[in-house]
């Protein structure tokens, strides 16, 4: 996701950008050079801030902060916040039905937090009593055990995950969210407050990935259900409010339609790469062991354990095979330790290497004969099309848009978690030079013709110009209806009227310069503690792609 945001921002210098970066904690590292047309960047740490306003409103006059806290009296909380909190808890009982009223609830919460103190409101006795009484009443008569610890953690989650809506949302021409999740709520608020067009790009399906993460979490049933309902509600509100939802592959559209997006608002925009940078090597090194290369952050969604088991399968036919995984192996230390233990258990220590972060992704793929992807969830993985552009045959699991990239037999697609077919497919290619060469040639050709960065940037440029009311080429084609969609009625708001002085020949020139699209997020959090919480359902979705780039 970070690679995508960097490409789009760097590639559209005519668009002024204001960034809203939702991060896991305060321990963040800015690892991308921001161009001059990025006018501002606002970080919102969900965890770790003793006083969140130090980050969310760092430029606010101290007197304003003091006055907001002073007006957050017990009476104000009881009159204004408790009814909103109760409405939210009631909405969580049926997140699949979220629509206009729930979008307005998000806006009303934002209006409240702009005027009153978020921290004082959640820490109040009135809020705790309302939360406890409402939840226990909802659970009355059910078989679900709800402990005091569950209630405390549930309220803490609400405190943290609602931080992105605690500050004023500036008026822009377009709001662009990188997922239908908590970061996207800025788009919901801006549309209802200002009539701002709202665009969502779906790399993966946020709710689906939370289901996967929570299934392995050690939390109670109550907490798992509570968080999944919250994510479901937030995702659906984003979907039904968005003017355009652009998945990075058609595969995601099925989920989007089931989550309330009408087909006429779904316009797929594939990821794109610079095929002049990602190129085949000039020559192959002599004497290299048969090598399988992977670019992946080491955490559960990438299912590195299946890749390790596939290595054990492949070495039966290719005894000197070497698997090399490039990518951050510190983001989930317990998972990395499990992988290391599995390597030892299977006796593949001499065949499997975690090589860490690679500082030159365009040459990473040259270090293998074949590229492998073992993920259990993806959007449209950059790593697959980068490998294709570098002339590396691909063996990948059937997740996300992988089949759309490898259409026509350009690679080998195997079932997720299927270490036997994955290992056999890799062995087949390593032992068949002619087939590797054919797939390399056809993969490179498809990457150049279909997945160049120019096509992606043109589609996003058109999207921005269209929704900003500027002359534009036709939008990407809308999605054909699914066989069994269950769309909700979209939230309808009249488009904003642009000033007459607004430039008509570009988005960044002219006498009347206005703030431009908001892209949440572009800053990734490399904190191991936060990443571990993330994969247990306690944090935001992964901020980067395969390597966290």
Descriptions of predicted regions:
Residues 322-337:
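Glycosyltransferase donor-sugar binding loop
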């Amino acid at each position: 996701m970070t690679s995508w945001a960097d490409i789009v921002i760097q590639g559209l210098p005519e668009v002024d950008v204001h960034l809203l970066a939702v991060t896991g904690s305060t321990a963040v590292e800015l690892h991308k050079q921001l161009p001059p047309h990025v006018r501002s960047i606002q970080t919102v740490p969900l965890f770790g801030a003793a006083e969140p306003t130090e980050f969310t409103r760092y430029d606010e006059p101290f007197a304003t902060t003091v006055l907001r806290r002073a007006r957050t009296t017990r009476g104000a909380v009881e009159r204004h916040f408790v009814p909103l909190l109760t409405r939210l808890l009631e909405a969580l009982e049926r997140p699949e039905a979220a629509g206009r009223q729930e979008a307005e609830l998000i806006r009303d919460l934002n209006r409240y937090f702009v005027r009153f103190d978020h921290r004082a409101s959640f820490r109040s006795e009135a809020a705790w009593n309302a939360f406890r009484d409402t939840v226990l009443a909802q659970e009355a008569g059910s078989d679900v055990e709800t402990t005091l610890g569950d209630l405390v953690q549930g309220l803490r989650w609400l405190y943290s995950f609602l931080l992105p809506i605690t500050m004023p949302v500036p008026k822009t021409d377009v709001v662009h969210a990188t997922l239908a999740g908590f970061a996207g709520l800025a788009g919901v608020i801006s549309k209802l407050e200002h009539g701002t067009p709202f665009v969502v790009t779906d790399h993966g399906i946020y709710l689906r990935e939370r289901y996967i993460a929570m299934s392995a979490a050690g939390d109670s049933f109550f907490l798992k259900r509570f968080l999944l309902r919250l994510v479901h509600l937030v995702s659906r509100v984003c979907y039904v409010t968005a003017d355009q939802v652009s998945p990075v592959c058609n595969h995601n559209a099925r989920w989007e339609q089931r989550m309330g997006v009408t087909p006429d608002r779904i316009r797929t925009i594939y990821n794109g790469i610079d095929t002049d940078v990602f190129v085949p090597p000039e020559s192959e090194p002599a004497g290299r062991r048969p090598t399988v290369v992977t670019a992946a952050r080491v955490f559960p969604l990438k299912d590195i354990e299946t890749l390790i088991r596939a290595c054990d399968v492949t070495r039966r036919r290719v005894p000197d095979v070497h698997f090399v995984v490039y990518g951050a192996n510190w983001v989930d230390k317990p998972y990395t330790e499990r992988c290391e233990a599995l390597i030892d258990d299977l006796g593949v220590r001499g065949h499997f290497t975690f090589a860490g972060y690679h500082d030159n992704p365009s040459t990473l793929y040259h270090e293998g004969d074949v590229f492998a992807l073992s993920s259990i969830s993806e959007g449209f993985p950059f790593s697959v099309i980068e490998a294709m552009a570098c002339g590396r045959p691909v063996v990948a699991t059937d997740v996300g848009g992988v089949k759309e990239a490898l259409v026509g037999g350009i690679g080998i697609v195997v079932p997720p978690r299927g270490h036997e077919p994955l290992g056999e497919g890799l062995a087949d290619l390593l032992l068949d030079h002619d087939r590797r060469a054919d797939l390399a040639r056809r993969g490179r050709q498809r990457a150049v013709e279909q997945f160049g960065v120019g096509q992606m940037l043109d589609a996003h440029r058109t999207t921005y110009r269209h929704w900003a009311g500027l002359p534009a080429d036709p939008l990407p084609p809308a999605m054909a209806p699914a066989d069994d969609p269950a769309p909700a009625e979209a939230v309808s708001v009249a488009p904003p009227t642009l000033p007459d002085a607004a430039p008509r020949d570009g988005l960044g020139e002219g006498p009347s310069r206005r703030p431009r699209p908001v892209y949440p997020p572009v800053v990734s959090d490399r904190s191991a503690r936060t990443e571990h919480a993330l994969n247990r359902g306690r944090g935001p979705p992964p901020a980067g792609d395969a390597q966290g780039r």
